[in-house]
Amino acid sequence: MSLQQILNSRSWVLFALTAALLTAPALAEDPRQLATLEPAAQETLRTEMRGQLITLNRIITLLVANQVQEAGEMAEKELGRSAMGKHARQPFEARPGPQMPREMHQLGITGHLTATDFARVAASGDREKALAELPKLIGVCVACHSSYRIR
């Protein structure tokens, strides 16, 4: 089959349309604000975000198992005020906080403080109250990830 026959074939048209449809979302402009961070800070932040996602999953798993106080302890240790500043001893180029736009950094701080609020409620052992607090915590995550990107 010649190149001209391939280009004129229905298979080629279907392939081209499929390729265009699959790549269109990737080519669409991302409306989130780009936070320009040094590569080392990007890696630090991405590693931290993956860890926090795992922690949120563990917290939800603990709540399902009615281990509410344990969920609160984990939230405070891994996400709360206790987790703030853990990158302070790293070289500047690896520290995401000081390189973030001010509003993005403030959302991060709000996330830590909201995790501490969740932990305080969970310390009571009242699962319903803890579950009622959880959307506030996850809502801060959603707000930041919906507003900012690092690539």
What kind of feature is each model-predicted range?
Residues 12-23:
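Bacterial N-terminal signal peptides
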Residues 24-28:
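Sec/Tat signal peptide C-region and signal peptidase I cleavage site
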Residues 29-151:
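Sequence context surrounding c-type heme c attachment/ligation sites in exported
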Residues 1-9:
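N-terminal secretory signal peptides that target proteins for export/translocation
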